[in-house]
Structures are given as structure tokens and as C-alpha cells.
């Protein structure tokens, strides 16, 4: 699978808005639930890339039924509705929006599957302005650029330094 190219000259320093949070899409459902309930604020130093979800499909980010909603905020209420554990949604309706998250961090190949702009839009309308992943699917890079979402490849610790791919 082709990964987005990185332009080393495009490094920028970004800051988290005071009071906003970073959400980590971990492989551990309990850590996800605790973050969504506001019981846990993880840091990059707490996790390895192997602890993060890989191959997050756009169909999981916004299932087809969620895409029939017209208003972006309605689509955002169902962000990640396709991720289930024992046939139950891991992300309750509106949970990502209500969590006060501004950054979302995941593993390899985020956004694989169908080219679905609503996947990125659901994050953006949930308050996410920065997506960090070990790698992104090419279609997700294009959708993120179109939606004006800042993307960074490879989770990097310290000083808020992120590397931004160009689509």
C-alpha cells in the first residue's frame, strides 16, 4: 500500500489549544472508553505505535448509514460508529464531539477503504484539527487537505514537533 510522501521542509510547530485534549485510538477498548468518559488523558510517552489501532477503515470512521445525514454536525455525532466490540458501538453517539479533543492519534494506514470525505469531516466537525498517524492512506490525505485538517505522520514525542505530509 502506498503511503503519503513526506516533505522534510514542511515541518511546523503546532500547539494544542488550552483546555483541549488529545485522543489516542488504542487497540485497548477500555482505554478508549476511559478517554471518551474523561477519566484518562494519555500522552505520547505513555504508548508505543504498536499500542495504536492500525488499518482504520473509512467505513468504521463513518459507516454508510451515517453518510446520509445532511448536516456535518449530524455526521460528526456518529464519528467512529463502525468500531464495535461484541456488536456494540465503542464510540457512543456524540462521544468524540463531547470529549473536547483537538488531536487524534492512530497507528499505521489510517483511512484505508473507500474514499470517503465524510470520515475526515466527522473528525473535523467533532473538534479534531490535527490527525497524527504512523501512516495514512492516500485517499485520506486528499480528503484531509480538502477539509483543511493538519496531518502529521509518525507519532513524535516532545516539543509539539509534527511532520506534515503534502497531498
Question: Where in the sequence are the language-model features?
Answer:
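Fe-S-dependent hydro-lyases/dehydratases of central metabolism
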Residues: 1-167
